[in-house]
Curated annotation (Swiss-Prot):
<dbReference type="InterPro" id="IPR036968">
    <property type="entry name" value="Enolpyruvate_Tfrase_sf"/>
</dbReference>
<feature type="binding site">
    <location>
        <position position="23"/>
    </location>
    <ligand>
        <name>3-phosphoshikimate</name>
    </ligand>
</feature>
<dbReference type="InterPro" id="IPR006264">
    <property type="entry name" value="EPSP_synthase"/>
</dbReference>
<dbReference type="GO" id="GO:0009423">
    <property type="term" value="P:chorismate biosynthetic process"/>
</dbReference>
<dbReference type="GO" id="GO:0009073">
    <property type="term" value="P:aromatic amino acid family biosynthetic process"/>
</dbReference>
<feature type="binding site">
    <location>
        <position position="341"/>
    </location>
    <ligand>
        <name>3-phosphoshikimate</name>
    </ligand>
</feature>
<dbReference type="GO" id="GO:0003866">
    <property type="term" value="F:3-phosphoshikimate 1-carboxyvinyltransferase activity"/>
</dbReference>
<feature type="binding site">
    <location>
        <position position="125"/>
    </location>
    <ligand>
        <name>phosphoenolpyruvate</name>
    </ligand>
</feature>
<feature type="binding site">
    <location>
        <position position="170"/>
    </location>
    <ligand>
        <name>3-phosphoshikimate</name>
    </ligand>
</feature>
<comment type="subunit">
    <text>Monomer.</text>
</comment>
<dbReference type="GO" id="GO:0008652">
    <property type="term" value="P:amino acid biosynthetic process"/>
</dbReference>
<feature type="active site" description="Proton acceptor">
    <location>
        <position position="314"/>
    </location>
</feature>
<dbReference type="InterPro" id="IPR001986">
    <property type="entry name" value="Enolpyruvate_Tfrase_dom"/>
</dbReference>
<feature type="binding site">
    <location>
        <position position="412"/>
    </location>
    <ligand>
        <name>phosphoenolpyruvate</name>
    </ligand>
</feature>
<feature type="binding site">
    <location>
        <position position="171"/>
    </location>
    <ligand>
        <name>3-phosphoshikimate</name>
    </ligand>
</feature>
<feature type="binding site">
    <location>
        <position position="172"/>
    </location>
    <ligand>
        <name>3-phosphoshikimate</name>
    </ligand>
</feature>
<dbReference type="InterPro" id="IPR023193">
    <property type="entry name" value="EPSP_synthase_CS"/>
</dbReference>
C-alpha cells in the first residue's frame, strides 16, 4: 500500500474526464434491485470499497447477482420483498454509511438475528436517531458496544405506524426508512423533527424508489406518507449516472488552472444535488457550459463567496479549496454534518488548510477561509477520508507541490482518481 503520493506543481489543466458511477446511486439501486421483483441490469456501477461492502452483504443475505469483469455491470436477481434468514449472521460494512444505514432498516422488517458491524470510524458515526425511529415502529435492536453507534444487532419486528425522526444529523437515516417502509405491514407516517439536512439526497432516494414502482408523498419534506404492503418492481435496466461530487474536483481544477475541463456522466438531466457545485463555480467567476450529460468549466478570476451549503456537504469541501485561489474571504455555512462523515471534516479541513498557509476560522457549523499569502509545501493528513485526499490534490495547482498521505483512501469511492486527475494535467 502506498504511504504517500507526492504531486509536483501543475501548470495547466485541460481535457475530458468520464466520471465513475455515483456512490449514492450505486448502493441505493443495488439494495432496491435486491428487494424488487424481477432481475435488474445495472450499468455504470461504481467499483469501489463502499459498493463492494454492499455487494458482499447482499451475497451473504442470499441475493444472487452476476458482476462483469470490470465490475461496472451487475445483473441482480431480486427476491421480491424483505430478507428472510433462518440463522444468525454478521455483516461487515467497513465505513460505508450508504450500506449500513439502509440495510439496518430493511433487515428490521422481518424476524432476523443480524449483526451489522464496521471499521473503527464506523463505530464513531452516529446511528441512534435511526435506531430510535425503527424502535418506534416495533423493531427490536441492540447496541453491542456503545449506545447510539455500531455495531448493532437487529432482531426484526418493524411494522410501521407513526415515526418521529431527527432530521439534522444525516439524510441517510430518512433514506433508510423511505426504502424500507413500503414493505412494512402497516402504513407509515414519518414526521421530521428539526431541519432536514442534505435534502437533494432525499430527492435522489425518492426518484429511485419511483423508478422501482413505488410513489411516496410528502408535505414540504416535513412529513412523509408511505403506504405499506407494497412491492418494488424491476425497471429492467438502469444506468447509473456519474458521481457529481467527484466531478467537483475536475471542474475546480479548470477554474483554478484551466484551460477547460469537461466532465461527462452528469449534466442538466442529473438527479444529484451536487451538480449545484457548477452553479457555485459560476457565481465565483468561472465560465460554465451545460449539456444534458456533461458540464464544462473554463478558467476565470475567482472571487470569494458566502453561502449556506447544507444541501451539498460533499461538494462544499471543494469550495473550501477554491477559497485558497479566490479574492477575499470565503464562508461556508450550515455544515455541522461534516463532523459525522468519514472523519470530523470541519476539524480536519481546518488543520490541513492552516498547514499550507490559509487563515481559517472554525465554528461549530461553519468555516471562514482566507487565502494564504504564500502557499507552503506540506504533507496532508487524509484521516482515511477519500474526499480529503481528492480535495487537497488541488493544492498542486498553486505553484507548489503537495504530499498526500495515505492516498489509497480514495478507493472508498474513486480508485482511479489520481490517474484521471493527472490525465488532464500538465506539469
Amino acid at each position: 500500500m502506498q504511504n504517500s503520493l507526492d504531486l509536483k506543481p501543475i501548470s495547466h489543466v485541460n481535457g475530458t474526464v468520464c466520471l465513475p458511477g455515483s456512490k449514492s446511486i450505486s448502493n441505493r439501486v443495488l439494495l432496491l434491485s435486491s428487494i424488487a421483483k424481477g432481475t435488474t441490469c445495472l450499468t455504470n456501477l461504481l467499483n469501489s470499497h463502499d459498493t463492494q461492502h454492499m455487494l458482499n452483504a447482499l451475497k451473504k443475505l442470499g441475493v444472487r447477482y452476476n458482476l462483469s469483469d470490470d465490475k461496472k455491470t451487475c445483473h441482480v436477481q431480486g427476491i421480491g420483498g424483505p430478507f428472510h434468514l433462518s440463522e444468525a449472521i454478521s455483516l461487515y460494512l467497513g465505513n460505508a454509511g450508504t450500506a449500513i444505514r439502509p440495510l439496518l432498516s430493511v433487515l428490521s422488517l422481518h424476524k432476523n438475528n443480524i449483526l451489522l458491524n464496521g471499521d473503527d470510524r464506523m463505530h464513531e458515526r452516529p446511528i441512534g436517531d435511526l435506531v430510535d425511529a425503527l424502535i418506534q415502529g416495533g423493531a427490536v435492536i441492540e447496541y453491542k458496544k456503545n449506545k447510539g453507534y455500531p455495531p448493532i444487532c437487529t432482531k426484526g419486528g418493524f411494522l410501521g405506524g407513526s415515526i418521529f425522526l431527527n432530521g439534522n444529523i444525516s439524510s441517510q437515516f430518512l433514506t433508510s426508512l423511505l426504502i424500507s417502509t413500503p414493505l412494512a405491514l402497516k402504513d407509515t407516517t414519518i414526521f421530521i423533527k428539526g431541519n432536514l439536512v442534505s435534502k437533494p439526497y432525499i430527492d435522489i432516494t425518492l426518484n429511485l424508489i419511483k423508478i422501482f414502482g413505488v410513489n411516496i408523498e410528502h408535505d414540504s419534506y416535513n412529513v412523509f406518507y408511505i403506504k405499506g404492503k407494497q412491492q418494488y418492481k424491476t425497471p429492467g435496466k438502469y444506468t447509473i449516472e456519474g458521481d457529481a461530487s467527484s466531478a467537483s474536483y475536475f471542474l475546480a481544477a479548470a477554474a483554478i488552472k484551466g484551460g477547460s475541463v469537461k466532465v461527462t456522466g452528469v449534466g442538466k438531466k442529473s438527479i444529484q444535488g451536487d451538480i449545484e457545485f457548477a452553479n457555485i463555480l459560476e457565481k465565483m467567476g468561472a465560465t460554465i457550459f451545460w449539456e444534458d450529460y456533461s458540464i464544462t468549466c473554463t478558467r476565470n478570476k475567482l472571487n470569494a463567496i458566502d453561502l449556506d451549503m447544507n444541501h451539498i456537504p460533499d461538494a462544499a469541501m471543494t469550495v473550501a479549496i477554491l477559497a485558497l485561489f479566490s479574492k477575499g474571504t470565503t464562508i461556508i455555512r450550515n455544515i455541522y454534518n461534516w463532523r459525522v462523515k468519514e472523519t470530523d471534516r470541519l476539524s480536519a479541513m481546518t488543520i490541513e488548510l492552516r498547514k499550507i498557509g490559509a487563515i481559517v476560522e472554525e465554528g461549530r457549523d461553519f468555516l471562514s477561509i482566507s487565502p494564504p499569502i504564500f502557499f507552503q509545501y506540506s504533507s496532508i493528513e487524509t484521516y482515511n477520508d477519500h474526499r480529503m485526499a481528492m480535495c487537497f490534490s488541488l493544492i498542486s495547482l498553486s505553484g507548489v507541490g503537495v504530499n498526500i498521505l495515505n492516498p489509497n483512501c480514495i478507493s472508498k469511492t474513486f480508485p482511479s482518481y489520481f490517474k484521471d486527475f493527472l490525465s488532464i494535467s500538465k506539469i
